[in-house]
């Protein structure tokens, strides 16, 4: 399915959203974050921003009920969003998460900090990678929409692994968003 509207959520720096927008030549219609210290608005022009300031706001995500006019035609992406999505939002909206762990091959990388889990046991993994999956109530259990992987043979440092996972993450988002978003004119 293709969506006309795109809402992106982040808790970290927002850098992934900046890089994705450059790759796909499309910006989100709205960016929601619980971290306004990243100054993402200086890097992505022409986007409405909403900053969540209380734990209730980013725990319930009721803001989605306020800003989404057409749930069937709206894609919501989690780009470094570090919060659990409430079950009612998982079923009501089309939400997809980028996960920097190749959970299709290594289900033990589900959940928090898969990069560190992989690094601790890098000798067990012949490849590393990222997925984009639908968000469901169970963490990292939704249908996989796309994945990308690279060999771990030449990864010698944690920083090299982070770089490789960042590249696979951008590749998965690039593929997924180009397939599922209409371009804005």
Language model features by range: what are they?
Residues 1-185:
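One-carbon transfer enzymes
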């Amino acid at each position: 399915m293709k969506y006309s509207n795109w809402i992106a959520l982040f808790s970290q720096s927002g850098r992934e959203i900046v890089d994705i927008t450059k790759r796909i030549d499309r910006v989100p219609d709205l960016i929601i974050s619980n971290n306004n210290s990243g100054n993402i608005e200086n890097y992505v022009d022409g986007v409405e921003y909403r900053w969540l300031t209380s734990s209730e706001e980013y725990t319930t995500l009721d803001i989605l009920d306020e800003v989404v006019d057409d749930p069937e035609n709206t894609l919501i992406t989690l780009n470094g969003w570090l919060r659990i999505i409430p079950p009612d939002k998982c079923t009501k909206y089309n939400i997809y998460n980028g996960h920097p762990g190749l959970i299709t091959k290594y289900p033990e990388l589900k959940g928090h900090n898969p990069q560190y889990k992989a690094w601790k046991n890098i000798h067990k993994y012949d490849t590393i990678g990222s997925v984009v999956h639908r968000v469901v109530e169970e963490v990292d259990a939704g249908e996989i929409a796309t994945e990308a992987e690279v060999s771990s043979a030449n990864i010698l440092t944690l920083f090299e692994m982070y770089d490789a996972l960042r590249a696979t993450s951008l590749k998965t988002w690039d593929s997924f968003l180009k397939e599922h978003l209409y371009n804005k004119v």
